[in-house]
Amino acid sequence: LSFALAAPTGKASKVLGDFTGEDAKTIHRLLGYTPEGFMYNEEYQLPYDALIIDECSMLDIFLAKHLLLAIDPEKTRILFVQDPAQISSVSAGCFSRDCIDSKMFPVTTLTKIFRYNDDGLIKVATDSREGREFLKGTGIEVFGDNKNYVFIETSKEKTLETVKKVYKKFIDAGIDPIDIAVLTPTNKHKLGT
């Protein structure tokens, strides 16, 4: 069985390759993009039995068209993988959402997160997206097995003082400043992010 792994962006294809231990390409590279067009097309099709396309929520209708023209549907099977909470295509159309909504294709929904199991931010984002309550109202709450996401409730008057205090604790604990992000509910004034 011959197969290829691809994703719409360089970063997504790198993550896919690192995670699987297999070579993964951008869809443009898979299709042999040049300024004159795509090397693989309806006349000269991809030679694979299977394609796995990750992060396909970012796949626009134009690139999807070129990808589908470059395969023989009698020979090649495609598995499109996406997280519906991820960003959509920045170009026209939302190919994957349209395919799902059409109900013309089999869809399997995965509900357990494996790759980020210990990540607090992913846990909070998932709980929030699924409507689960995650804040207990205790003032300071820490999330994740590796305690990498901290929620601190404070008054408007004490926000700057609290941020400085917590930031200093993180620096004193040896955490690289590049790994620290402070999120506030405003983007204006001296307290904005």
Q: What does each of the following model-derived ranges do?
A:
Residues 2-49:
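Inter-Walker segment of RecA-like/P-loop motor cores
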Residues 31, 58-60, 87-88:
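Catalytic P-loop NTPase motifs of RecA-like helicase/translocase cores
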Residues 36-49, 59-60, 68-76:
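Short basic/glycine-enriched coil/helix segment immediately N-terminal to the Walker B
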Residues 51, 59, 79-80, 182:
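Hydrophobic positions in the central parallel beta-sheet of the AAA+
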Residues 54-55, 82-84:
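Walker B catalytic acidic pair
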Residues 84-193:
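Conserved helicase motor core of P-loop NTPases
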